[in-house]
């Protein structure tokens, strides 16, 4: 993947000509009726950001949700890009806390799959995971 992602984010990789790899995770979320989605981008995110600007494809509600895109904030105190998924979540905890959602789904934007996140959530609740 290194060669493929030198000039674009992995989530923006074309799949079958008209899709991007992130489309599968976003479609899964939309089909699972998730209304508020945060995307944490890191580097080479221009083409991914351009693609995400057309978020009408996934119909994330604007009144009670929406599609939120976060890039790393590099400051004098923090000169790092995200150092993995856990760090991206940690640096954006304020978004998660202010969302007032009882549950959060964390999914990768570089995998191609179809999943009903409601079934996953039901299982986790049932097992008290």
Model-based region annotation:
Residues 127-129:
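A short, conserved acidic/glycine-rich loop-to-beta-strand motif
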Residues 1-4:
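A phosphate-binding catalytic loop at a beta-strand-loop-alpha-helix junction
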């Amino acid at each position: 993947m290194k060669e493929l992602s030198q000039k674009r984010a992995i989530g923006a990789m074309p799949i079958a000509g008209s899709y991007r790899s992130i489309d599968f995770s976003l479609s899964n979320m939309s089909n699972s009726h998730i209304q508020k989605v945060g995307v944490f981008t890191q580097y080479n995110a221009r083409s991914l950001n351009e693609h995400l600007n057309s978020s009408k494809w996934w119909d994330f509600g604007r009144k009670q949700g929406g599609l939120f895109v976060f890039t790393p904030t590099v400051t004098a105190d923090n000169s790092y890009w995200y150092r993995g998924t856990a760090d991206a979540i940690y640096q954006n905890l304020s978004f998660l806390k202010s969302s007032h959602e009882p549950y959060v789904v964390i999914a990768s934007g570089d995998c191609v799959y179809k999943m009903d996140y409601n079934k996953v959530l039901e299982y986790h609740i049932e097992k008290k995971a």
